[in-house]
UniProtKB/Swiss-Prot annotation:
Tagged with keyword NAD: no
Catalytic reactions on record: cytidine(1402) in 16S rRNA + S-adenosyl-L-methionine = N(4)-methylcytidine(1402) in 16S rRNA + S-adenosyl-L-homocysteine + H(+)
Organism of this sequence: Clostridium botulinum (strain Hall / ATCC 3502 / NCTC 13319 / Type A)
EC identifiers of the protein: 2.1.1.199
InterPro entries on file: RsmH, SAM-dep_MeTrfase_MraW_recog, SAM-dependent_MTases_sf
Entry's family note: Belongs to the methyltransferase superfamily. RsmH family.
Role according to the record: Specifically methylates the N4 position of cytidine in position 1402 (C1402) of 16S rRNA.
UniProt lineage: Bacteria, Bacillati, Bacillota, Clostridia, Eubacteriales
Protein name: Ribosomal RNA small subunit methyltransferase H
Matches recorded under Gene3D superfamilies: Putative methyltransferase TM0872, insert domain (1.10.150.170), Vaccinia Virus protein VP39 (3.40.50.150)
């Protein structure tokens, strides 16, 4: 299948980077290269773009899309490792970094990847198919209490306890091998009247995907490391697609903007923790009505931006 992905909040994200034509920029989630191409259009031959993705299909697609540009470095890795990636490339500081945390349209539409609850496929959900842990491992090997906590914390699923119990009961008969089997278990666990609120499997699939790819653990460290690698006035722009991610970005930005831990009664700061960033977006930027109509997957997107000081 051709790698297709419509970049969300494209114009807003590029504008937020305040691109310098001879600057160095990092696209932490290269995908099909949509954001990267717009960055490259604004760079001179002295500028440079580093494109990172853990999905080899994404890198292959991006190389084709960006074949007319010579100032691109492709890295097959997880942006969790941005610090060591830049170290290996002998790059000290950069002028801008973007992260688009959404699952690509290709990954959702390619049934064999197991991300979609709309298509029957093997339970996989790995962004990086070289990793060992898959959705199959989570569903068939995790204890009931572990499953419950994942569904509750990562999926904010109100029926997490019941779904976890149904999964464990079903797998005692035979291993649960496909997304279709998992969807049926979820349907049986959630009362019919609550299944009118969108697809019943949406929250569970989100939770399992986050667990498989360690998405939330990765995000906190990646934000800190990214800010440390920015030049003065460099920008970090992050697009999230669900409340858990957005909350992490919001809280981490606030911590980096106002890190002082001194009691309010202290007349001056004595903790020595100085602000690292200035938050550009006091409220997140959301897609326009037109973009939401054109690309339904953009509806939950939020863009938050900060500037290194």
């Amino acid at each position: 299948m051709e790698f297709k992905h419509i970049s969300v909040l494209l114009e807003e994200t590029i504008d937020s980077l305040n691109i310098k034509e001879d600057g160095v920029y990092v696209d932490c989630t290269l995908g099909g290269g949509g954001h990267s191409k717009e960055i490259l259009k604004k760079l001179s031959h002295k500028g440079k773009l580093i494109g990172i993705d853990q999905d080899t299909s994404a890198i292959k697609a991006a190389k084709e899309r960006l074949k007319d540009y010579e100032n691109v470095i492709y890295v097959h890795n997880n942006f969790y490792n941005i610090d060591s990636i830049l170290e290996e490339l002998d790059i000290d500081k950069v002028d801008g970094i973007i992260m688009d945390l959404g699952v690509s349209s290709y990954q959702l539409d390619e049934a064999s990847r197991g991300f979609s609850y709309m298509k029957d496929a093997p339970l996989d959900m790995r962004m990086n198919r070289e990793e060992n842990l898959s959705a199959y491992g989570v569903i068939n090997n995790y204890e009931e209490e572990e499953l419950f906590k994942i569904l509750k914390n990562y999926g904010e699923e109100k029926f997490s306890r019941k779904i976890a119990r149904f999964i464990v009961e079903k797998r005692t008969e035979n291993p649960i091998e496909t997304t279709g089997e998992l969807v049926e278990i979820i349907r049986k666990a959630i009362p019919a009247k609550f299944q009118r609120e969108g697809h019943p499997a949406k929250r569970t699939f989100q939770a399992i995907r986050i667990e498989v790819n360690k998405e939330l653990q990765i995000l906190n460290k990646a934000i800190e490391d990214s800010v440390n690698r920015l030049n003065k006035d460099g920008r970090l722009s992050i697009i999230t697609f669900h409340s858990l991610e957005d909350r992490i970005v919001k809280v981490k930005f606030k911590e980096l903007e106002k890190p002082c831990t001194c009691p309010p009664s202290f007349p001056i700061c004595v903790c020595g923790k100085e602000p690292q960033i200035k938050i550009i977006t006091k409220k997140p930027i959301e897609p326009s009505k037109e973009e939401k109509e054109i690309n339904s997957r953009s509806r939950s997107a939020k863009l938050r931006v900060c500037r290194k000081i």
